[in-house]
Amino acid sequence: MKYIGAHVSAAGGIELAVERAVAIGANAFALFTKNQRQWHAPDLTAKTILAFRTACETAGFLPEQILPHDSYLINLGHPEPEALEKSRVAFIDEMQRCEQLGLCYLNFHPGSHLKAISEEESLRRVAESINIALDQTQGVTAVIENTAGQGTNLGWQFEHLAAIIDQVEDKSRVGVCYDTCHAFAAGYDMRTEADCIATFAEFERVVGFNYLKGMHINGAKCTFGSRVDRHHSLQEGNLGTAVFEFIMRDSRFDRIPLILETVNPDIWPDEIRWLRQLG
């Protein structure tokens, strides 16, 4: 079974994200559990936690169908000690919020070296940050997202993801979210079935499908290998549709959240229906 949905708004209360997912015909969804553009957020109340858990249970969403995303401010590979510590504290808080809500994943961008330290050192800091967070939480898997490689962002090469995972002590609580637009921008071709076979074989060789915990299903406004992060609707842009057909027909992508972050929320119901028809 394919779990397909979108990153829906949690405005007005995180339990409303569940209603919005149901409204677009989704059986998966992503959300922010706090304002993603602020460092601090009020603690979750018992009332909020109960409302969210009840909404999920009523709508039939299991934890493995939900892929929460952390704040964009967090940089777990930051070169400066004070800024790194600030990011780590915020990341632990995000993990704890997921734990309170009964969620099993937290999706995040690995971080940036900001041209101040080496890639290797920044990747080491990301892994160390994950280890610290896992020690202080239970039941939540840290899900590293591949990036487009814009600026000094790490995570655009499969080898970056593998290097982080290799240094995480509890391998059972680390995973990867594969973003189709980001991979295309980073130079991983998926424009034909043959391209998909080759790219996902490389993913299996370098990272491993056992670590794949979710996907972001996005078209690409950016050009191939441009290292620029620009999403598009599924049937528009430069990526084409072969990869979406490939994903929908391959059982390796079953039972993980397949999350739209495409540019027009008005057509999310149509895009979800279209993806289901491909399978």
From Swiss-Prot:
Belongs to the AP endonuclease 2 family. GO terms for molecular function: deoxyribonuclease IV (phage-T4-induced) activity; DNA binding; DNA-(apurinic or apyrimidinic site) endonuclease activity; phosphoric diester hydrolase activity; zinc ion binding. Keywords: DNA damage, DNA repair, Endonuclease, Hydrolase, Metal-binding, Nuclease, Zinc. Its cofactor is Zn(2+). HAMAP family: Nfo (MF_00152). The gene is nfo. PROSITE patterns: AP_NUCLEASE_F2_1 (PS00729), AP_NUCLEASE_F2_2 (PS00730), AP_NUCLEASE_F2_3 (PS00731), AP_NUCLEASE_F2_4 (PS51432). It catalyses: Endonucleolytic cleavage to 5'-phosphooligonucleotide end-products. Zn(2+) 3 binds at residues 182, 229, 231. Zn(2+) 2 binds at residues 145, 179, 216, 261. Zn(2+) 1 binds at residues 69, 109, 145. Endonuclease IV plays a role in DNA repair. It cleaves phosphodiester bonds at apurinic or apyrimidinic (AP) sites, generating a 3'-hydroxyl group and a 5'-terminal sugar phosphate. One of its GO terms (biological process) is base-excision repair. The lineage of its organism: Bacteria, Pseudomonadati, Pseudomonadota, Gammaproteobacteria, Aeromonadales. This is Probable endonuclease 4. Binds 3 Zn(2+) ions. It comes from the Bacteria. It is an enzyme of class 3 (hydrolase). Its EC number is 3.1.21.2.
